[in-house]
Amino acid sequence: VINSSSSGRVSVKKSQAKYKLFGFLTDEVMAQHPDYAHMAKNPVYILRDALSKLGFKVQKGPVPLMDMRLDATELAHGKAELDKLVTPEKKTICIFTFATGSKCYSPEWWLPVYETLKHRFPDYNIAEVLPAENVSQINFAAPTFYSHDVREIAAFIAASEVFIGADSGIMHLASASKTPTLGLFGVTQSFRYEPYGNGSVPIDTNVTDANAIADIVAGILDKG
């Protein structure tokens, strides 16, 4: 249970489970894991700590990466869907310009970023994944893709070289597709929600402009 959720703690307390974890770590465990506050890693550390106290041998290594475990057929389908929209001979930068509430960046923010990416990476396609709301903060300037199937979306993103998007479910889906993910953070705490692994990085947009974002993209593409 998330330790800040009182209703969650009550629900767990009333459950019939033999063992119940209420989402708290000791100072000692937190000192061992500087990333303990990350929402994907915290439950793993809690479970490992509990199992260790029960006498089980537990892993000590990094928390495994999120992984959709896309198979070869799904990946091939994702690439085929991408190739329908862009120049197949070029590699692709994938973007998602939507998010909920205050996490959503305005067209005035996104359009300069999009134009900078086009200028800095003329040899790359840029494709946009759309939300269910069918809105684009770049006014549908790039080829767009949408699916009701999250695995199909993940496979589409996996066919790209890098993904850029605000803190959202699609950002985490991109990370789980094993695509290097640039997570944009302006109002939420990146240390709790940042994408991790596979070259993914959080970006504080309060101090990072379009050119700096493009520099980070260039660094990822150069490693590719």
Question: What annotation goes with each model-predicted range?
Answer:
Residues 1-224:
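Catalytic machinery of carbohydrate-active enzymes
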